[in-house]
Amino acid sequence: IGTPGDKLDVLVAMNPAALKTNLADLKTSGIIIANKANYTDKNLKLSRWELNPLEDDSLRDYRVIALDMTRLVSNAVEDMDLSVKLISRSTNMFALGLVSWMYDRTLDPTINFIKNKFAKRPELVEVNIRALKAGYNYGDTIEEFQHIITVSKAEFEPGVYRNIVGNQALCFGLITAAEKAGLDIYFAGYPITPASDILQILSGYKNFRVKTFQAEDEIAAIMSVVGAVFCGDLGITATSGPGMALKGESLGLAVATELPLVVLNIQRAGPSTGMPTKTEQADLLQTLFGRNGESPVVVLAANSPADCFSTAFEACRIALEHMIPVVVLSDAFLAHGSEPWLIPQTKSLPKIRTHLVEKPNG
């Protein structure tokens, strides 16, 4: 699983209040870039710092780079007739230029943004671009940084790409699997963040023989899916951690009756009801063992928003070909994160074999 994590590597603190508010988000040994021109006695008092943190040892666990951005921007635009207020408001571009140098990022996209943003104010275009370049050049000339961090360009396979978010990719994978299996989709769910929009997305694809049902609770949702699978549909439900706990008994029934349903667990943080808008990957053991008796299920986990497509397709294939429930683990970060997705050629995907009973026994 690839994730940027929850902690910052670099914190730009333009004033004492910003430092106090955001310091907890900076990882130990992270870099603090501060505009010391704003660390005045008045600002320190307003933000409840007893001493100037740039001058005592309270930030000893971090690497502090304190510089007078206001003066440096003033020097960069000294030939322009600008107010002190306007110069101060441009210091953020100085900081952005410095960070761009630290991460070896070209300034061209930012310069184009500035030109478009302030197209009707040429003086703002000029001062912001000068401040941006001043910050970039400052990083290139001082000796505070031993090395820069180069983020190389992504290498893409040839083909047609589109931007896709994780939950959308899951839906496309389910629909593609149903087409390859020659089955209708029956999806039932109860609204729960961050899985709710799967129901909303699938509801827009009735032309692909997708039937959707918003149930009154989590148990009703999965039990209706059990019934739909028994009648020959590709049955799917989606939930998050709290709903997964409620679905346990019904999932055990699907195991006992060898019904190939698919459960999408879009994980969120915390026990019990949890935190709807926070992400976590803590439901693996619950998914593997959170049912009474011998009730094994196949568990797959996506590793990126684009991979959600392949994971959903594979989940349906395994479920239908081996007559067993499959649980797909995603999370809020993947569900709402986006990335370029290589649209696969339909012929490159395998046909899915089904085991539908078409005539009476005997």
Predicted segments — roles?
Residues 59-72, 278-327, 331, 354-358:
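Conserved thiamine diphosphate
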Residues 42-59, 280-288, 345-361:
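Acidic, Ser/Thr-rich peripheral helices and adjacent loops at domain boundaries
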Residues 42-48, 76, 248, 271-278, ...:
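Glycine-rich, charge-decorated loop segments at or immediately adjacent to ligand/cofactor-binding or catalytic sites
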